[in-house]
Amino acid sequence: MNQWMDLAERVLDGAEVTNQEALAILNCPDEDLLLLMHAAFHIRKRFYGKKVKLNMIMNAKSGLCPENCGYCSQSSISKAPIESYRMVDKHILLKGAKRAHDLNIGTYCIVASGRGPSNREVDQVVDAVKEIKETYGLKICACLGLLKPEQAERLKQAGVDRYNHNINTSQRNHSNITTSHTYDDRVNTVETAKQSGMSPCSGVIVGMKETKQDVIDMANSLKALDADSIPVNFLHAIDGTPLEGVSELHPVYCLKVLALFRFINPSKEIRISGGREVNLRSLQPLGLYAANSIFVGDYLTTAGQQETEDHQMLHDLGFEVESVEEMKAGLQSACNTEV
């Protein structure tokens, strides 16, 4: 048994990955990459088999954000030429939900730019979510920014299953990325969502000049937060943002990062998110030996690959898409457990 499979077995037996072991994963010799990914898949298979969860983003409100996040094309300091608009009408949200349902995508993610939602924007999302649930039964994830407890309660009661608010980077690196809100603001929103009964979703953006130790700290912070779903983004540096020109990550390093997140958060949904196509490139399929979830279609202000290419990739891998009906059954089981 090689060192990575030995570590995987210990993780499955309940052991936690030490900092030294985590650094070893990120520093894994390239010639041992397939051994590492095989061990990551050994963990993934225990909890998810060969299933892959599909997610689709609806950019419900674009631009117009007062925050100064250095990676974001929608921020107040960005000069990127993006489309800006206020919260879209309900029929647009319903149209997106129908498309997700028709493509057998189980999770529909409603994302709005800004520091946090106004009560009117929460009203709009609540109104749409009720109809989406009744008509299509999709799993709904909302990502609306910093959240107040009463807003979280309303979203939960309307049928929002999951709330996303990423920590983005390590606490140590946070002030290098933004100064308009704190790391604790982000953590508190995840906790607020969790306290309302929504499933907490929080992830990271790798490639923002952080160290390997920062990446390890991110994975451990999400373990401490007990995030059910962890989107791992790889920076897609956009012209007009402060991080424009930052070099793309090497695909092999991206795979090691995904393996690290699987080892540290063995039972969680690990989703390969923004920047998948430009950073992993031809090695995208290997990422799913560690991750068990992807976004299908476009991201917020950058294009993803065609849905047909994603489905072909999954078919070629021999993986199975979690259908909308399977997702519904899982939600019902979770509801019964809560009762």
From Swiss-Prot:
Positions contributing to [4Fe-4S] cluster binding: 65, 69, 72
Residues forming the Radical SAM core domain are 47-276
The catalysed reaction is: (4R,5S)-dethiobiotin + (sulfur carrier)-SH + 2 reduced [2Fe-2S]-[ferredoxin] + 2 S-adenosyl-L-methionine = (sulfur carrier)-H + biotin + 2 5'-deoxyadenosine + 2 L-methionine + 2 oxidized [2Fe-2S]-[ferredoxin]
Q: Give me the comment on cofactor binding.
A: Binds 1 [4Fe-4S] cluster. The cluster is coordinated with 3 cysteines and an exchangeable S-adenosyl-L-methionine.
User: Which GO BP terms, alphabetically?
Assistant: biotin biosynthetic process
At which positions is [2Fe-2S] cluster bound? 109, 141, 201, 271
Top EC class for this record: transferase
Please give the InterPro entries that the UniProt record associates with this protein: Aldolase_TIM, BATS_dom, Biotin_synth/BioAB, Biotin_synthase, Elp3/MiaA/NifB-like_rSAM, rSAM
Record-listed E.C. numbers: 2.8.1.6
Requisite cofactors? [4Fe-4S] cluster; [2Fe-2S] cluster
Looking at the keywords, is Phosphoprotein present? no
Q: In which pathway does it act?
A: Cofactor biosynthesis; biotin biosynthesis; biotin from 7,8-diaminononanoate: step 2/2
Give the protein's function: Catalyzes the conversion of dethiobiotin (DTB) to biotin by the insertion of a sulfur atom into dethiobiotin via a radical-based mechanism.
Q: How does it assemble?
A: Homodimer.
Protein name, entry field: Biotin synthase
* Species assigned in the record: Bacillus velezensis (strain DSM 23117 / BGSC 10A6 / LMG 26770 / FZB42)
Gene name tied to this protein: bioB
